[in-house]
């Protein structure tokens, strides 16, 4: 009996510890006020690359005219596609606004479009370029090839921004757009129109803003990440306030993601030689992406290519970007389980039109898959229950000799071919599936604002009235009452506390996950009724 209790307690503690370890409470992110979307990107002050600040901001004065240029006034260029609206500025050649058309801040028809970038100060624009060697300033004024770009369906469009530096360099930034893709091409071209050969690197400055947004879940986090040397490197926001992070080998991309959206710079044929990540202000993460060093002789030119991504953390869309960009979604250890579950949910959604129904179907399928293990588990518990009288006799017989009692109990197990752990081990196999599904539901953009029925309007958010977790706790209680046990009454009462513990744990879980666990419990009760009739 003690072994059963110890195993149950250890499993319960293990689940709670695993819960805390896998889903740690995120560190608070103090930021200035202002309600914005869950993730907003902008560019922090862009000083010279050799002396990037660790904290604080510095206002940027109005830029002086570049050599060979007449004074000019900065203008906006609007790019409109089926998926987003972007606004670029001729000051700095950067991005000042980016709005997603397919995603809303809140559920329902009144929800506003998600805004990923929205800056009014020129020193906060995204995608600014800087190079001390070539005289390229993040504050330079550019001439634009057009005042507006409109791309629909599968069409293509481009925007060319050009400036000339005092070092005799004509610098071009060419953005290319597709009407049906979030991917934006960026070519930075250095043309030497002077008389002296120049050597240097061009830095692309990309800051992602960390905003004090309303969290949709307790475990929503912000995280800069970089794929370098074949591994995804995650950086802690608080650590970045103290110490910058730098990567300089085999860099495929650098990104910043929140729960549902991401901005990233993806290398093209080794176009990123170094990434330096700092936190120049509480509300910003600065990524200084440096190109390889290039030498440009008089009359020659050199081009550096990138892919820019602003959009949803949709597994299929991210995979299309190449360079393992889909790994910007951090599923932790349960990625091999979470990804197939996401693809399965998407497949079922095509036929059901409701992700809640898709989750229920997935639950049925998983129950069928695990039926042999569950059946074996309950059969083992039944067998243990039958041996309870004999175990009580052995305990009484060898009450003064624990070693002899243990040997006798093990011999009893061997004689009746009973595995004392047979009731627990099959259950342990299902725990990774539970956590994998948790990750899939928590970070799947498809479930964001996806309704089920009645009061459940967002399967990625908690049940607003806590109805489903309470019912789930009740079914767990019924399930435990039906489960064979060889515990004494006191131990059994202790185990009945587990449904209460799990109910409180599930109160703030995504409603889609609670539906899975609730349906799973109902199916388990039906299965237990069947086993109780067939296994005697």
Swiss-Prot record:
Disulfide bond positions: none
Pfam families: 60KD_IMP, YidC_periplas
Family annotation (InterPro entries): Membr_insert_YidC (IPR019998), Membr_insert_YidC_N (IPR028053), YidC/ALB3/OXA1/COX18 (IPR001708), YidC/Oxa/ALB_C (IPR028055), YidC_ALB_C (IPR047196), YidC_periplasmic_sf (IPR038221)
Keywords per UniProt: Cell inner membrane, Cell membrane, Chaperone, Membrane, Protein transport, Transmembrane, Transmembrane helix, Transport
Record-level Gene Ontology MF annotations: membrane insertase activity
HAMAP family: YidC_type1
Family label: Belongs to the OXA1/ALB3/YidC family. Type 1 subfamily.
Subunit annotation: Interacts with the Sec translocase complex via SecD. Specifically interacts with transmembrane segments of nascent integral membrane proteins during membrane integration.
Stated name of the protein: Membrane protein insertase YidC
Native species: Geobacter sp. (strain M21)
């Amino acid at each position: 009996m003690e072994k059963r209790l110890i195993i149950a307690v250890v499993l319960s503690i293990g689940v709670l510890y695993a819960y805390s370890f896998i889903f740690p409470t995120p560190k608070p992110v103090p930021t200035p006020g202002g309600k914005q979307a869950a993730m907003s990107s902008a560019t922090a002050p862009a000083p010279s690359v050799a002396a990037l600040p660790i904290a604080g901001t510095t206002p940027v004065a109005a830029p002086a005219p570049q050599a060979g240029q007449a004074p000019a006034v900065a203008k906006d260029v609007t790019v409109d596609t089926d998926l987003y609206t972007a606004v670029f500025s001729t000051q700095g050649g950067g991005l000042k606004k980016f709005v997603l058309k397919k995603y809303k801040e809140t559920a329902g028809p009144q929800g506003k479009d998600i805004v990923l970038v929205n800056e009014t100060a020129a020193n906060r624009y995204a995608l600014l370029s800087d190079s001390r060697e070539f005289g390229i300033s993040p504050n330079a004024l550019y001439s634009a090839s057009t005042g507006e770009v409109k791309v629909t369906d599968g069409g293509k469009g481009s925007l060319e921004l050009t400036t000339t530096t005092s070092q005799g360099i004509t610098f071009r930034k060419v953005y290319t757009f597709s009407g049906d893709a979030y991917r934006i091409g960026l070519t930075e071209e250095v043309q030497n129109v002077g008389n002296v050969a120049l050597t240097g690197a061009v830095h692309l400055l990309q800051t992602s803003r960390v905003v004090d947004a309303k969290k949709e879940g307790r475990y929503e986090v912000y995280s800069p990440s970089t794929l370098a040397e074949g591994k995804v490197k995650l950086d802690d926001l608080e650590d970045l306030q103290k110490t910058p992070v730098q990567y300089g080998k085999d860099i495929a991309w650098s990104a910043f993601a929140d729960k549902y959206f991401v901005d990233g710079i993806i290398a093209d044929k080794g176009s990123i030689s170094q990434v330096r990540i700092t936190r120049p202000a509480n509300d910003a993460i600065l990524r200084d992406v440096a190109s390889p060093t290039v030498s440009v002789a008089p009359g020659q030119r050199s081009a550096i290519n990138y892919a820019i991504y602003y959009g949803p953390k949709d597994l299929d869309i991210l995979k299309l970007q190449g360079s393992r960009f889909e790994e910007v979604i951090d599923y932790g250890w349960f990625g091999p389980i979470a990804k197939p579950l996401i693809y399965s949910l998407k497949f079922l959604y095509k036929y059901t039109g409701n992700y809640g129904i898709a989750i229920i179907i997935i639950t049925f399928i998983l129950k069928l898959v695990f039926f042999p293990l569950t059946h074996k588990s309950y059969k083992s518990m039944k067998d243990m229950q039958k041996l309870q009288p004999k175990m009580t006799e052995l305990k009484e017989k060898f009450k003064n000799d624990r070693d002899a009692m243990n040997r006798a109990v093990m011999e009893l197990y061997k004689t009746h071919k009973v595995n004392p752990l047979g009731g627990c081990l099959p259950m342990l196999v299902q725990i990774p599936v539970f956590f994998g599904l948790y990750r899939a539901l928590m970070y799947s953009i498809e479930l964001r604002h996806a309704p089920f029925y009645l009061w459940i309007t967002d399967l990625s958010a908690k049940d607003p009235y806590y109805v489903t977790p309470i019912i789930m706790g009740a079914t767990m209680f019924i399930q435990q009452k039906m489960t064979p046990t060889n515990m004494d009454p006191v131990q059994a009462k202790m185990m009945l506390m587990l449904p209460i513990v799990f109910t409180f744990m599930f109160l703030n879980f995504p409603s889609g996950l609670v539906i899975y666990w609730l349906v799973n419990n109902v199916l388990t009760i039906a299965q237990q009724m069947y086993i109780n009739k067939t296994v005697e």
